[in-house]
Every structure is written in structure tokens, then in C-alpha cells.
Amino acid sequence: MKFLIEDNIKFMQQFSIYHTSNELFLKAILRLIEKCYYSNFKSVILTTDVHQQEMLNKNLWTYSRKQFIPHGSKFDPQPAKQPIYITDELQNPNNASVLVIISPTDIAKILQVKEYIKVFKRIIIITDLLENLKELIIKINKFTGQENKIDCFTQNPIGTWNKIA
């Protein structure tokens, strides 16, 4: 990976965009969170608002019948000990290496907070709006100063991912 020096801040991140349908949206989010957890990646899940945050929190409690996925939110004690931390604010209390951004309404606004973004090694964006895909890629490329460094996946109707870029 290359380093890009911009405003004296080094960026070395892997960006991935996952596009899914509205019908599979929640299931896709839960599977990606589960994959982060089982890969031993501490993660921050950035939601659009407190309602989405609580919906994810509630669904993670009942998602897997096999094993509980430990997680917490800003309403829970000991955020530093949570492997999965769900929030609607730009926080990283668990020293996560992965940032999962769900349905970003303004990705440019999030990316502009460079001191926040630079601490993550991997940034995953999940969206159900196909028309935003090209716009997301342009904004990320502008942020990183690199082109074609973004992995893009789309989910087919049976739930598997196909790499599109």
C-alpha cells in the first residue's frame, strides 16, 4: 500500500464499498459485522442516527443462534472493551482498526474529519442506493488522492457478493 501525505497526515487505508438491495440490507450489515468479529477486527459501526444504532444493537442480540456477537453502543458501559461498537457519532473508544459506515448521507463530511478517519486501517461502506455508488467512489478518490484503490461489491438476490471494481 502507498502512503499519501496530505496536510501532513498519512493515509494508508483499504476502502471497500458494499452495495445491497433494500430487502437484504439489514442481513448484509449483520453478516459483515459478524465477519469483522470472527476475524478479530475491533470495529466501529457508524450509523446515520440513533434509531439505526438501536435497531442494529437490538438485531445483534438475536442475530446468531450459534454464538452471541459481543457489542455495545454509547449507551452501554465500558465502551473500550467492546469488540464491536455501534454509534451515530465520530467515536473510536475501543481503538478499532475497522470503520463500517452504514448508508452515509454525506460521506464527504465524514471523510473531512481526517484525524478521525486516519486511525482506521480499513473502511467499509454499506449502501442500498446504487445511484450513490459512483458518487461514493469519486468522493473517496478525492479524499485519498488515489484512483481505483476501492474494492466495490454488489450483492445478488441470493445474498452472495460479486466484485464489480
UniProtKB/Swiss-Prot annotation:
GO biological process, one term: DNA replication
TM helices/strands, residue ranges: none
Keyword Transferase recorded: yes
Any Pfam family: DNA_pol3_chi
Leader sequence segment: none
Gene3D superfamilies according to UniProt: DNA polymerase III subunit chi (3.40.50.10110)
Entry's EC annotation: 2.7.7.7
Gene Ontology MF term list: DNA binding; DNA-directed DNA polymerase activity
Catalytic reaction(s) noted: DNA(n) + a 2'-deoxyribonucleoside 5'-triphosphate = DNA(n+1) + diphosphate
Keywords: DNA replication, DNA-directed DNA polymerase, Nucleotidyltransferase, Transferase
Domain of life: Bacteria
Alphabetical list of InterPro entries matching this protein: DNA_pol3_chi, PolIII_chi_sf
Quaternary context: DNA polymerase III contains a core (composed of alpha, epsilon and theta chains) that associates with a tau subunit. This core dimerizes to form the POLIII' complex. PolIII' associates with the gamma complex (composed of gamma, delta, delta', psi and chi chains) and with the beta chain to form the complete DNA polymerase III complex. Interacts directly with the psi subunit (holD). The only subunit of the DNA polymerase III holoenzyme known to interact with single-stranded DNA binding protein (SSB).
Protein task: Part of the beta sliding clamp loading complex, which hydrolyzes ATP to load the beta clamp onto primed DNA to form the DNA replication pre-initiation complex. DNA polymerase III is a complex, multichain enzyme responsible for most of the replicative synthesis in bacteria. This DNA polymerase also exhibits 3' to 5' exonuclease activity.
Protein family per UniProt: Belongs to the DNA polymerase III chi/HolC chain family.
Alphabetical list of NCBIfam families matching this protein: PRK06646.1
Name of this chain's protein: Probable DNA polymerase III subunit chi
Source species: Rickettsia prowazekii (strain Madrid E)
Top-level taxonomy: Bacteria, Pseudomonadati, Pseudomonadota, Alphaproteobacteria, Rickettsiales
